Amino acid sequence: HFDTFYSARYLTTLHLRQLHDLLAGIPYEHIIILANTDHYGGGGIYNSYTLTTARHAAFRPVVVHEFGHSFAGLADEYYYDDQYVEYYYPHIEPWEHNITTMKDFSAKWEDMLPKENAQKRTGKKKRAQQEISPLDTETIGVYEGAGYQSKGVYRSTPNCRMKTNEAAAFCPVCRRSIQRLVQFYTEAGH
């Protein structure tokens, strides 16, 4: 159903138990549910399922975005200028790999940050950041605005599939998270 958490586009299922019962005799690792509607929306529940609408024009980027949530536990990187709720608290590091509050940045993408971009982290090179295209999904830095919040939560690139439908791809940080999970499931001993 739509309107999960009072969001017109957030789509989830109320019948998860029945869904798993229906699939009980079929080997599966991940569930992707396609809703036969042209209404915009979707949802991705980590380690559970991806749900998206199949007939909306933005189906392809939305299903990939929601898969990022459900398969790899990636956070939303978009934000609102008029935020009314703190989803992430400034003194706690989010568990998702692709956003940070800078409380434990070494556990995130600090190792991927080019040395020449290290000063961006401290805000000393604001001008250099402004020269980067807002559609850039590859230039790693620390960019404020993520996790629905315009301030205090950061993402790794100007754009990513977890930020907009216009992004050409996942950013390197998100790709690494996905790759690590695939390796976990496919390496010997798992």
Q: What role is predicted for each listed range?
A:
Residues H1-D82:
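Active-site-proximal segment of zinc-dependent metalloprotease catalytic domains
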